[in-house]
Amino acid sequence: MEENRRNPSAGMEVPVAGGGNVVKWIEISVPSPSVSSSSIGANSSEDNECVQLPLSEDYASSSVIGEPSISFVWRINKTSPNALELLQLSAKSGFPITGLRFVFAQTLSPFAFVYADEGGDSGRLVYFLYSLTPSGVVYVLKLSNTLAYKSGSVFPLDHLIHLDVRPYLNESRVTSVAASPGFIFLGRSDGCVSCFQPIVYFQKSSGFHQELRDDTGFGRLGTVVAAVQDLFISEVHGRNYLCVLHADGALRVWDILTYSRVLCQSIAAKNLEGVMCVRLWLGKADYDSGIIPLAVLYRKSMNDSMDVITVYGLHFSSAEGIALSLDSGLQNIPLEEGELRDVRFTSDKIWTLKANELTSYMLCQKSSTMEAQSYTLQEDYISEQLFLSSRSSSHDLLLTTHSLFSSAKDQIMGFISSIFLRRLLCPGIFHNVALRLTLLDHNKNWTDSEFQSLSLDELTSEILLLVEHEVTAETSISVFHWWKNFCTSYLHHWCSNNEPRTLLVQSDVIGLVRNNSVSLFFRLENAEHSLGGSSSEHSNLTSLDLGVSHSDHEILAEVLRCTSKISKQWGGAPYAMYYESITGRPIISSDEIVPRLVNILESGYSTTIGQRTWSDLGADRAWEKELEAHKNLRTFSIDMLLSLSALCQRAGSWEKVFTIMEHYLQYLVPKKSMQKNDGEALSDICSSILVQATSQFVKVMFESAFDIFLLISYLLNIAGQVNMSQQDICKLRLELLPMIQDIVSEWLIILFFVTTPAESTSMEDFSLKLSSLQIDSSIDKRSWNAMLGKCGFSLAFILLFSDRSCIVDGRFNLRYLPSSQIITSLVQNFISWIRYSKTGDDSSSLLRRSTELSLRLIRNGQSDAVERILVVVEASLRGEKTFGCSQDTSGDWCLLQHLRGCCLLDQVQRGASGILRERKIIDAIRCFFRASSGEGSWKALHSLSKEAGFSPATTGPSILDGSTSSAAWKLHYYEWAMQIFERYNISEGACQFAYAALEQVDDAYNFIEMTEEFDPTKAATYTRGRLWANVFKFTLDLNLLNDAYCAIISNPDEEIKRICLRRFIIVLFECGKTKILSDGHLPFIGLTEKITQELFWKAGRSDIMMKPNPYKLLYAYEMRRHNWRMAASYMYQFSARLRSEGACKDYKHMSLVLQERLNGLSAAMNALALVHPGYAWIDPVPEETTRYPVKKARRAEEEQLRSNDQPKGEKSCIDIEKLQNEFVFTTAEYMLSLKNFGWTYSGLEKPPSDLVDLLVQANLYDMAFTVVLKFWRGSALKRELEKIFENMAIKCCPAKGTLWSSPNLMLTSNDEEVTHSPDRSPADQGSKLAGDWEILEVYLKRYIDIHARLPVSVASTLLQADSCIELPLWLIQMFKDGQKEKALGMAGQEASPASLFQLYVDYGRLTEATNLLLEYMESFASSKPAEVLKRKKVSGVWFPYTTVERLWWELEKTMNSGRMVEQCHKLKEQLHHALLNHLKLLKVDSNDAVSSATG
């Protein structure tokens, strides 16, 4: 077996999209065959399965279709063997957010195939999907539009083909399947291949099935063909050939067009028993060499020896037809441990995918040595980043962190969590599903949609709360263990949900299809190998093109071996700690982190580490750890001293070493790309690939530069031990150290851009910030704004999407997925654009370019990230020799300070609190003062006025180029800063800039000459007055009353001074600090009357409902002075304003306003009651108030002058009676508002007609009677009482169609249709009506003495509303009680039996009328002996005979109409009989009366 030479990692895996992308699957049910479905179900059992393909846990594959190419990826998951998932991937779009999941009724075999064809006349591509069931049913799905399907739908039958292949298999088993457009090939256990054309079958055409076999007839009986092991289809000159691998090692090639065999050759392993051919793969035909690469997997079944892939060359020639020949095996590829997942060919390589490794081998037709290149899978990258690998372990991080911090375990715990969180949520490491499952292990339950909706801040808070809850030991070692376990669990879930399944090949692009993601691979350049490799790789540095000799390359290799030793000593801890210290929480100064790390490297870990971990590790274990650390330190120190001494001896001097190192440092500087970027814009998917690849590349460069940084710092610490001269030390300290610091800062900033997730921003709040900072927001970012705040969306995406064509030139063809070369070029262009902009101009310094990129981020609300970037840039500038010069001339440093101040202010505005808020405010103030102090600062800020948040003032001295006053510039800038702090409610900062602006006023106006139009003295006075007014406002906001008063008396503008004084007094009253006015603390002289004036001014211009209320304060003030009338006047004005403003303002609780009005009127009446009756009056509410020179007062005056032109009536004085009347109206309005009835008192002296009706409607009967009795007399009073009781009676009537009954009260007509009220049930309505009857009874008895006819009005109203209603007994009794002596008939008062009888007749209540008449006639006839004498007097008896006659005619009329004939006939007979008896009795009584009179 030939030798294979394996090199270290040749490339990296790049995810196509961030881990936050989760595909939403659209489920589509695929119907089963309609014919003999029961038999298919029966034959689908294991015993009757005719398709027996090799089993696998999960099946996945892919194909590239069309031009431009579209990749289709499909998968059959072991958890859902009856579902096939299809994903479409295109270089012109983003990562697909939806995919198709076809759910079949049967289990699927591990096979599927997709191809495209033109869809007839439409010209659109139509996709066909092949699938196969173990029972032998082929499904062909026609997909016309992959975006048109809806979840839960059923696949249309007219686009579905079922083909049952069992009748054509001759009872053999299917052992292999392959497909090409229009064909499906089934390799059988009898050695034959069945070829089917499902489309032809669907068209009912013949010839849809063919068999590929060696011969026919009797000759075949003597030939035994082994079972088909594998099938593969290859295309040569437009013709498809089927390669068939048999179990005995025979290889047969068939021409699909002619169904003829063109090659038959054995490739079985010779002289080796038990070795069988398992799989077959072919590459694309190479027409230059006439060879098709062919690979066969050999496996020995008897023992556990490794599998081998042998690569053959299948030669073809097309002189006369196509002739094929197979050469002997050229190359052997041994497969070590790990399951082989896939094998693919590219133009010059063969790729093998195993569960934990991707390897490529160059195809060499002449050499027997195959160079193997291994590519780093994402699992290895994630484990290294999470400190779970041997190169980067959490133990190194633990020891280094304990040694780095001198104390404060809280700092250590927070620092540790911050490092792990940053790594965990970094794009390329973060995976949505894996993290959700990890948190599920910790009892954090979220659904997929809920978890996807979490922002970065919310996710961070949840994890930190989990740490706080679960880490109970409260020690740093416990936090380390928790994070190690958490990351281990996360890595496990990541690997379980992202197992490699198959390779995706598109031209020379190699992709990897995982369970839940897709990724590409790009090769590392030779330089990157040398930078990021081990010490053995540093021997080949000629590819770096440093411009040095071969011997110098060897010296450089020794230097890099020294950096490798330092890196090995540390592990991955220093990179993470340095990055977190610079970009994270400011726990350690950026100037201290590297010296501390070097001290640890030189003297070892802190001796207190054993004490810090005593309780966790125990004394013995801690001591062992300390001894081990000391031993490793001694070994490392000796090895480094020997290596550095040998390095110096080899070079001849340290100067030579430093010169070579300087060349190397020049190479580490980010390269400029001078290509003209005029290509098309990057798509979303290419942008994602670019950002992921850039992050991995920049990480290598950053770590390489940081290794040199540590080496140089280490050399400075041990300079005496390696015989370094003072000149060498100076060169190292003053030249190389600043240079490497700049390089590290540049790579760190780029790394920060590509790995830091963008923070979420509320667009509503952000628009306000944009308008306040005057930052341009014209960029259309609606398409990607939703990604802000997600873990997979870094700051680099914002930079890319703001200018998508910034890094693309004409060399790139972005119609396809980017190849490794294109990815590398894009990465280089992107880095160059970030560092040097589009032009790559040398004048684009780090400071200038950082501010340009910061502006792009500020436009998108990334103030936190910008602030950290500017901190890094500022720290880098502190180490430059030209720092002072750049600060004084270019203005870039001033712009940096200005932007950082804006970011700090934004952080304060967004919720910083406590000490952190105070620190950020102080830093922001310091930044703005620094920004104004540099030379040329006004030019830099003035040019970016619309974007950087600075807008030049429109008043005061102007700033013109060539005649610029430093004081004028600072005055403008300080005023702007004052306004910004004021806008953010940061009074302490605004006050400082107001004081600073005051210091510049005199100098700013000194250089301006006086003209007729402009007086600089007056302008300066006005400016000082305005600034002192601002100082007054800010000190008042800060509750610095003494300083506020000093600002008042210092103000030179008398008008502004008076306004401030007014404000000062008002604030004192509002804050409850009025004692300062009278305790002599402040020298107020003659302000007794001004207090009243100012408070009254405040009362007239403030919200009437404010608390404390100025009117009430005035009332109390005048009451204490015994000025009763003024006190009453203030309270009446208070009530009047409430009345006038309450109607036009939408108060939330109008009842509170009315209550305040009642209190005001009551207080006014009480005050006037203390005055002599002859003087108990107040003036009307004044229409004019004292005029003050303010805008509001001037507007009020203008409105007042306009209203004066209209005629006005004279207003009389207001006495107690008028107050009482208004009190009654206001009480009515208040009570109506409590019942949600709208009525407003408009100042009338008499109540309107609708007021009483509203009160009755609202059940406010007492108030209604109060109004009536207050404002009406005589007959008008009786009319209003009747109206009230009529309305009350109507409310007692049940609604039409409501079934209701109450004993002894009333009965409704039962011949109406019964319908329930929509707002209450019959029982509730009945209860309410019963209450209405009781209320009516109470009030009727109360007011019947005032108006005796009220019962008649009530009864008439009830009968008019419902003629069938039964009057309540108590109401009938009121009519009967009106007749005190029944012997006298039905006569009586207004509410008499006769009036009740008349009502019965009027409303058709014939039965009740007859019964009532009969009752009184019987009573008349059965008089007691004592009453007979009274009855026999003249005119002693009266009955309403006219009404009786009407009753008689009504009965006859009813009978004639045919209604109630029997009942009316019976009533008529009773009436007739009673009348006869009554008349007889009357005749006898009359005769007796006549006899008595004549006798």
UniProtKB/Swiss-Prot annotation:
Task: Describe the disruption phenotype.
Answer: Pleiotropic phenotype with diverse growth defects and early flowering. Enhanced ethylene response and sensitivity to cold stress. Reduced EDS1 expression and enhanced susceptibility to virulent Pseudomonas bacteria and oomycete pathogens. Accumulation of nuclear poly(A)+ RNA and high-molecular weight SUMO conjugates.
Task: Indicate the secretion signal residues.
Answer: none
Tissue expression per record: Expressed in roots, stems, anthers, siliques and vascular tissues of cotyledons, leaves and hypocotyls.
Q: Does the keyword Ion transport apply?
A: no
Q: Name one GO biological process term.
A: response to cold
Disulfide-bonded cysteines: none
Per the record, membrane topology reads:
Peripheral membrane protein
Q: What is its main location?
A: nucleus
A GO CC annotation recorded here is: nuclear envelope
Which domain of life, per UniProt? Eukaryota
Pfam families per record: Beta-prop_Nup120_160 (PF11715), NUP160_helical_2 (PF17238), TPR_NUP160_120_M (PF23354), TPR_Nup160_C (PF23347)
Q: Where in the cell is it found?
A: Nucleus membrane; Nucleus, Nuclear pore complex
Keywords tagged on the record = Membrane, mRNA transport, Nuclear pore complex, Nucleus, Plant defense, Protein transport, Stress response, Translocation, Transport
Assembly description: Part of the nuclear pore complex (NPC). The NPC has an eight-fold symmetrical structure comprising a central transport channel and two rings, the cytoplasmic and nuclear rings, to which eight filaments are attached. The cytoplasmic filaments have loose ends, while the nuclear filaments are joined in a distal ring, forming a nuclear basket. NPCs are highly dynamic in configuration and composition, and can be devided in 3 subcomplexes, the NUP62 subcomplex, the NUP107-160 subcomplex and the NUP93 subcomplex, containing approximately 30 different nucleoporin proteins.
What this protein is reported to do is described as: Contributes to the transfer of mature mRNA from the nucleus to the cytosol. Required for both R gene-mediated and basal disease resistance. RNA export seems to play a critical role in stress responses and regulation of plant growth and development. Required for proper expression of factors associated with auxin signaling.
Q: What is this protein called?
A: Nuclear pore complex protein NUP160
Q: Which gene encodes it?
A: NUP160
